[in-house]
Amino acid sequence: MTNNLSGYRNKIVRVKTAKKRPISSSNWLRRQLNDPYVAKARLEGFRSRAAYKLLEIHDKFRLFTPNMKIVDLGAAPGGWSQVASKLIKASDNNLNNKIISIDLLKIEPIVGVEFLQKDFFEKDTEELIIHGLDGKADLVMSDMASNTIGHKATDHIRTLLLCEQAFEFALKVLKPSCHFIAKIFRGGAETALLNKVKREFRTVKHFKPVSSRSESTEIYLVALNKK
């Protein structure tokens, strides 16, 4: 995987603020139109720029191998599930090589991916995931984030709570010596969660992919080898 973006950087596109469009929406649209990773994802067939973040995480930590069972939390629009499907060489008829993806929003089919259009926090979701796995998972990955409101402390806490829920779920479904990755936003309140994770995994790292926007406080928690 390369982060060479030559050929994907376009002239700056300027967006006029429509009378009924909030300034924040115009800023988001401008950022999307001028983001080389958005252009690269479109040309290379990935559903989101987040695919490159997972590719970078894999390049650094070598998480994916054939014959894995993976849970993808907050999967829409499917960029991470796409990457995982390619890296484990998933197929629809190999039950030992599968991905269970969950999101409230629908995603289009991906080879080797069983999609549950569910709220992760509903009582029966966990049971459905475990049934779909038909055993324990080799990797739980979460790119879940709360809807941001522009208040960094609030956004930090909300996404941290999602990460904590994903971590508690991972402890239930992961095999020993297997892995957990999740998005968090830096903000100071993550220390308690990190200490919990360190008690349950042999190696815990922070990683900020190059493809993560420089102005974003997001980083990825990479927890390796569950005890």
Swiss-Prot record:
Q: What Gene Ontology molecular-function terms does this entry list?
A: rRNA (uridine-2'-O-)-methyltransferase activity
Name the chemical reaction catalysed here.
uridine(2552) in 23S rRNA + S-adenosyl-L-methionine = 2'-O-methyluridine(2552) in 23S rRNA + S-adenosyl-L-homocysteine + H(+)
Active site feature: K183
Q: Which Pfam families match?
A: FtsJ
A cellular component annotation (GO) from this entry: cytoplasm
Q: Does the keyword DNA repair apply?
A: no
What task does this protein carry out? Specifically methylates the uridine in position 2552 of 23S rRNA at the 2'-O position of the ribose in the fully assembled 50S ribosomal subunit.
* Name by which UniProt lists this protein: Ribosomal RNA large subunit methyltransferase E
